[in-house]
From Swiss-Prot:
It is found in: Cytoplasm. The keyword ATP-binding applies. Its main location: cytoplasm. This is Proline--tRNA ligase. The gene is proS.
């Protein structure tokens, strides 16, 4: 492929509106262009990468018996009314009317559409299981589209759906998809973790996310590729390292998810679902007499602990929440933070919100900071399981400026139930006891759900089972954010290349170090001077030879200065660059391996073998 025939509009500088490095490099290297807020055009290079990702997916889904189809993006609102999501999905749903004033939507996902198709065609368990998927454009009216392809209004998604007559069949397909996803992301070269996740608005029971880990900006060795004349990072002057660190610091760590994983273990979960080891305390502690004490000006846990000279673990914090139409009191230990997702899931609520200060004062006669469980009537009290272990606790007295000491559950106040409601902290023990918990930022690239009968019951998608009974089909749902996967790859494979000039000056620049299986082309042939007849003859010879060996080759046949060509080549980020320069008449070329920065001069006859050896 000739570069002069392609649309690769590189930029000399990083775009000023980019906040994450993947967005900046996709724009600067000419992979994408923004058409409007949250909407991007995938230019030829990006499209080639996306096609390679799609082909990897198709190969792995073929292995598990998933069949590709293509559903419409313009969907009738009637199906979404059947499932109940037309009213509940929220403002992110694109709603529109046709000329007959009928309601339609632009599909953000296709559970209703697929279920409608299946219910109209399948009536017997004998035709199940059915496993279908599509790779198509989706739409979501994001209030604040940002971070390039990571949070857009139009995006490319692979969404799969499976239908089953029994739970064992659903469980088997769910596991098949989990393994297929792991293979896909491994082939993409990603550092990722499958984690326990919240099903959220999708509904259903079991749910697992696949998160691409985004690196911090501290470990320079991860980010740097050194030229062949720099032996180690220690050789780079501190002033240059400081400049590099400053450059790294300009870019946000991408990823809206915080994941929790066990260092030294297998446990991993979204922070919304993460838990830690819980060991009930069986030691006997004498219950002391309840005592009301003045705590003037002490409202926070830290202030109360300091005033009473006690450990914060000896205190109980009282929160008040609206859960749908019910007011609920929540008890937590010390400075533990309430995990609202855990609370929502436990209550089965569709809506929760913290009560206001005014509401609390009107209901209980005290402000937050002096609120406590003793004497509360006609209100539901739920506590985190750690609260049950606290003996002789300090709690608010429901009078501003006062607290109780030596409060004990069962004697001084009642709790309806103790459940896991807290957000875990880094350094706690994994729930399986294998390793300590660490936090990391990450990008959600895949999500699988066991939806059960969430949609099939609502839409009357029934079959006759082996006994002739009418039952709702069981359903699974499996998604991969294909376009955001491109951004996740760049977040992990962006590199800063450091070179030392003949004058002993150190220079650095951003580049993309694409995994070999995903790079838009395998090899970049760069003739320095297109007016040099010997160079162009050798370029044509090498292109033909490399293509004959199965390589995908991009030839920079533009009449540009060498510096422009090399800068663009570095930005584009193909795994191998072959430079055809002044020694072309002798059959000598220069080979540069992007992943390592290694550069060698070789004879043209050694090119194929050299590339194979150096690329391993």
């Amino acid at each position: 492929m000739k570069q002069s025939k392609m649309l690769i509009p590189t930029l000399r500088e990083m775009p000023s509106d980019a906040q994450v490095i993947s967005h900046a490099l996709l724009m600067r290297a000419g992979y994408v262009r923004q058409v409007s807020a949250g909407i991007y055009a995938y230019l030829p290079l990006a499209n080639r990468v996306l096609e390679k990702l799609k082909n990897i997916m198709r190969e792995e889904f073929d292995e598990i018996g998933a069949v590709e189809l293509l559903a419409p993006s313009l969907l009738t609102a009637d199906l979404w009314r059947e499932s109940g999501r037309y009213e509940t999905y929220g403002e992110d749903l694109y709603k529109l009317k046709n000329r007959d004033s009928s309601d339609f939507i632009l599909g953000p996902t296709h559970e209703e559409t697929m279920t409608s198709l299946v219910r109209d065609e399948i009536t017997s368990y004998k035709k199940l299981p059915l496993n279908v998927y599509q790779i198509a454009t989706k739409f979501r009216d994001e209030k604040r589209p940002r971070y390039g392809l990571l949070r857009g209004r139009e995006f490319l998604m692979k969404d799969g759906y499976s239908y089953h007559a029994d739970q064992d069949s659903l469980d088997e397909t769910y596991l098949d998809y989990k393994k297929a996803y792991e293979k896909i992301f491994e082939r993409a070269g990603l550092n990722f973790k499958p984690i326990i996740a919240d099903a959220g608005a999708m509904g259903g029971k079991d749910s697992q996310e696949f998160i691409a880990i985004t690196d911090d900006r501290i470990n320079l060795e991860k980010w740097l590729v050194l030229s062949k004349n720099i032996t180690s990072i220690d050789e780079i002057p501190e002033s240059v390292l400081s400049e590099i660190q400053e450059e790294l610091g300009k870019w946000l760590v991408a990823g809206e998810d915080t994941i929790v994983y066990a260092e030294g273990g297998d446990y991993a979960a979204n922070i919304e679902m993460a838990t830690s080891q819980f060991e009930p305390n069986v030691a006997y502690t004498e219950e002391l007499e309840l005592e009301k004490v003045a705590t003037p000006g002490a409202k926070t846990i830290d202030e109360v602990s300091d005033f009473l000279e006690i450990d914060e673990e000896q205190t109980v914090k009282t929160l008040v929440y609206h859960a749908d139409d019910e007011l609920i009191v929540i008890l937590l230990n010390g400075n533990d933070q309430l995990n609202e997702v855990k609370l929502t899931n436990h209550l089965g609520a569709s809506f929760i919100e913290a009560a206001s200060e005014a509401e609390v004062e009107e209901k209980f006669g005290a402000h937050f900071g002096s609120l406590g469980p003793i004497g509360l009537e006609n209100v539901r009290i739920i506590a985190d399981r750690k609260v049950e272990l606290i003996k002789n606790a300090v709690v608010g007295a429901n009078v501003d400026g006062y607290h109780y000491k030596n409060a004990n559950f069962g004697r001084d106040f009642e709790v309806e139930e103790f459940v896991d409601l807290r957000t875990v902290n880094e350094g706690e023990i994994s729930p399986d006891g294998r390793g300590t918990l660490k936090f990391a930022r990450g990008i959600e690239i895949g999500h699988i759900f066991k939806l059960g009968t969430r949609y099939t019951e609502a839409m009357n998608a029934n079959i006759l089972d082996a006994n002739g009974r009418s039952i709702p089909m069981l359903m699974g749902c499996y998604g991969i954010g294909v376009s955001r996967l491109l951004s996740a790859i760049l977040e992990q494979f962006a590199r800063i290349y450091v070179e030392k000039t003949p004058r002993e000056e150190f220079k650095f620049s951003w580049s993309i170090n694409f995994p070999k299986e995903l790079a838009p082309f395998d090899i970049h042939l760069v003739p320095v001077n297109v007016k040099d007849e010997a160079a162009m003859e050798l370029t044509s010879e090498l292109e033909e030879k490399l293509r004959g060996k199965g390589y995908q080759v991009l030839v920079d046949d533009r009449n540009e200065r060498a510096g422009v060509k090399f800068a663009d080549s570095d930005l584009i980020g193909l795994p191998v660059r072959v430079t055809i320069g002044k020694k072309a008449a002798e059959g000598i070329v220069e080979v540069k391996i992007r992943a390592t920065g290694e550069v060698v001069e070789i004879n043209k006859d050694e090119l194929v073998n050299t590339i194979e050896i150096l690329s391993k």
